[in-house]
């Protein structure tokens, strides 16, 4: 906000943030600020959702980077925040509890090369997190090597776990063959929304549909996971989704 105030008289580089703020301001919803990540951000109808990242160390780590980038805006009129590899450390990892069912959504979070106080290392060494055993895991960062640690995954996943992930096809393709093999070794019940080795024909409708300024993806399928009364997970695939074992 301080950076926004300083550049308001010049060019407004924070239009998206301000638009979102104004939309929320004009609604009747309450905006809660959580001081303790041990409290759920949602708790109703037997469903609890916890945000377990980013932490205070991440705030401090990224604050220095954002200040440096904001300085470029103020003094050099740059129009882009170039966070590079560090961008993913601000990812919001979610724990969802539905009765006895435990789900972990990994977002795009990665392991930092040297700093164990941020990223996945900080989460996995947290005592409260270590109490969890997850039934379903949304693999972070499209199954990249920098998001995976076999020891940690084995520790926080249940024996009959289900893994699901989405590929990345812009630039370097993720997951690569090495990581596909590794993830299959960790969990035989792993699924991906599309096979990057295949080319999918565009449907005419998808050439016209747009979401904002981006085209909707035409190659991804869906991975639907349900649980019966005994807590057993059942996986239903649609579209171009396939078991990772077929790759």
Predicted segments with their positions:
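Active-site-proximal loop/helix segments of hydrolase catalytic cores
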Residues: 61-175
């Amino acid at each position: 906000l301080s950076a926004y105030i300083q550049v308001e008289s010049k060019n407004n580089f924070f239009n998206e943030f301000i638009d979102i703020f104004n939309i929320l301001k004009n609604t009747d919803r309450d905006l809660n600020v959580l001081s303790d990540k041990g409290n759920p951000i949602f708790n109703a109808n037997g469903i609890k959702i916890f945000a377990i990242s980013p932490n205070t160390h991440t705030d401090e780590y990224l604050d220095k980077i954002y200040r440096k980038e904001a300085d470029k805006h103020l003094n050099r009129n740059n129009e882009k925040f170039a966070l590079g590899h560090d961008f993913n450390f601000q990812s919001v990892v979610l724990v969802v509890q539905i009765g006895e069912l435990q789900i972990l959504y990994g977002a795009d979070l990665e392991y930092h090369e040297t700093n164990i106080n941020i990223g996945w290392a900080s989460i996995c060494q947290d005592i409260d997190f270590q109490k969890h055993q997850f039934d379903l895991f949304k693999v972070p960062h499209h199954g990249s090597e920098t998001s995976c640690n076999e020891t940690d995954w084995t520790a926080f996943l249940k024996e009959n776990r289900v893994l699901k992930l989405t590929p990345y096809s812009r630039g370097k393709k993720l997951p690569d063959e090495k990581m596909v093999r590794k993830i299959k070794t960790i969990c035989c019940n792993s699924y991906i929304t599309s096979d990057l080795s295949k080319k999918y024909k565009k449907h005419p409708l998808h050439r016209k549909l747009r979401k904002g300024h981006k085209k909707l993806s035409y190659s991804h399928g869906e991975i639907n996971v349900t649980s019966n009364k005994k807590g057993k997970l059942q996986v239903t695939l649609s579209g171009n989704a396939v078991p990772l074992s077929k790759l």
